[in-house]
């Protein structure tokens, strides 16, 4: 979720051809009374058995039965590569009709997208906190499709072995507990500041000290005193040996897998960590739990909430608008939202689906955190800022936090 947004670079020929094949330019355009829609979606699966391709092709087949004149071609792209590949496709004017993944604001700025109200009958059913995030200059273009929130996962067996009797509430608790776990030969706290999702891990720690990427007025505050102090703390946490070595080179998914193997005591995670734990076959459901994330002086009252968006491209004028609307109305039914969430351990984006899952023992605690969730900045400058965060913020825990954060702040101010 909130996926890799690197600067547009030359991708492999295979990647470009893959999206070119999905483009609705040229041979894939509609013919006669029939319509062909091309959907490019991020793959959230952990392998062939639960690839997102299977999910979307199932919806496409059901939809085609109900609407024989409309065919939906499905292409899924590795979650980590989605943004780069879509950007390359758009740059080459090979537009998909519908995308489901991350990142919409630059395309809205360029006038390439339909508004939500133009391609969905009931956009009011989308969760308000994320609908607002999907807006650009007062109009909604990004349609939240799947959401997630963050909690602190910890290994109860390692806690017991280390003599820890309760979940950490503060940063001091985190450090003390992590060092006790380290003394037992395991990694105390997993700190993924590598390129996969450093922007998310960083924000969780910023929030713990009253910081953020922006303040309430919308001013960039990346190098604020609070954030510098946060990374000074993390630098000390790393140097103490409480984390894995070199967090700036460690990606979230890799550390999640180590947690699932019982090698890490604590790590910040989302519901997407649960299937990794289940597939690891090392930790039973009673061996781990999740709780609110510890802040400097107490647990976070609001955590990071993220969502991935559907975007509908104005591909070939308005000739496909009605077909896109039919498909999105179909795909956003509660049964498909719930199916997606249970398959990939993510959260719904519609109010009706969230209500149906509120009492679910797995999803309930995460859904409870969503209404107060904090999101990433939604303006177009965030694309460049996020890339720099992913590439450099890990060096703040081994070098000079003030300098590293100041460089990112300069990028944000220059873009704004």
Task: Describe each model-derived feature in a short phrase.
Residues 178-182, 219-248:
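Glycine-centered hinge/linker elements that transmit conformational signals in sensory
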Residues 141-144, 150, 172-221, 264:
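Extracytoplasmic/periplasmic solute-binding protein
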Residues 102-149, 173-175, 201-203, 208, ...:
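Hinge/lid segment of periplasmic solute-binding proteins
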Residues 288-292, 340-388:
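Long, aromatic- and glycine/proline-rich binding clefts that accommodate carbohydrate-like moieties
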Residues 62, 66-128, 160-162, 169, ...:
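Extracytoplasmic "Venus flytrap"/periplasmic binding protein-like
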Residues 162, 239-243, 279-343:
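Extracytoplasmic/periplasmic substrate-recognition and gating elements
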